[in-house]
Amino acid sequence: VLDHLVAHDTYHGPTGVRYGPDPRHLLDVYQPEGGTVPGNAPVVLFFYGGNWTSGERAEYRFVGEALAANGIIAVVADYRLSPQVHYEGFLADCALALQWTLANAASLGGDPARVMVMGHSAGAYNAAMLALDPRWLAPLGLTPSRLAGWIGLAGPYDFLPIVDPHVQVAFGWPHTPADSQPLFYANAKAPSTLLLAARNDKV
C-alpha cells in the first residue's frame, strides 16, 4: 500500500542493477530529483526484513523515496533467502551489495566516505553484522571502518535460543554459533550506530 503512495517525482535512478552472479543479486538506486546530485551526498544501503524467508526490493520503493526526498542516495538490494541459503549466504550477499555501493557511490553523486547500511527487522540484523563482524567484508578487501555508520530499525541482535521454525532453518539451529549474533561483536570501536524501535513493539 505504501508504495502506491510514493511520489515518483522526487527521485530517479537505475533499477535492476546486478551486483553479483545470482538471480537475486539485484538492486535499485534512488537519487534525489531536481538537478545534479551533489558529489558529497550521503549514501544509504537498505536491507529489508521478512524473517529471512521473504521480501523483494520492489516492495520498498517508499524507503528509497523517503531517503531521496531528503537528499540521500538510497540503494535497496535483494539478497538470497532461506531455505535457499543459511545466514552465511545472505550475509555474503549483503557484503557484495555493500562492495558495489562503495565502488559506485561517487559515480552516483555520493560521498564514498559517507556510506551507511540500514535495515529493518531481519534486514537490521544483516546491517548489524556487516558493521560489527569483520568476517563478512574481509573476503572483499573491506573492513567495517569503511562505513560512516549503520542504522537498525526494530532489529534482532541477540536471539539465541531460536524458537521460530523458519529462523531455525536459516541459522542451522541447534548448531547455531554464538558468533552469529551481532551483540557478540559489540565494541566501542564499531561504526556509529543508531538503533530505533517502536514504543509498543513486542520483542
Across the structure, where does each feature detected by a protein language model lie?
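N-terminal cap/lid segment of alpha/beta-hydrolase-fold proteins
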Residues: 1-38
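Mobile cap/lid helix-loop segments that gate and shape the active-site cleft of serine hydrolases
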Residues: 6, 22, 155-185, 191
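Short beta-strand element of the alpha/beta-hydrolase
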Residues: 39-50
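Hydrophobic beta-strand anchors of alpha/beta hydrolase catalytic cores
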Residues: 44-46, 74, 193
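Short amphipathic alpha-helix adjacent to the substrate-entry channel of hydrolases
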Residues: 58-76
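Primarily recognizes the serine-hydrolase "nucleophile elbow" in alpha/beta-hydrolase
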Residues: 96-165
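Short, proline-enriched alpha-helix->beta-strand connector loops that line the catalytic pocket
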Residues: 144-148, 188-193
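Short beta-strand/loop motif that positions the catalytic acidic residue
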Residues: 194-197, 201
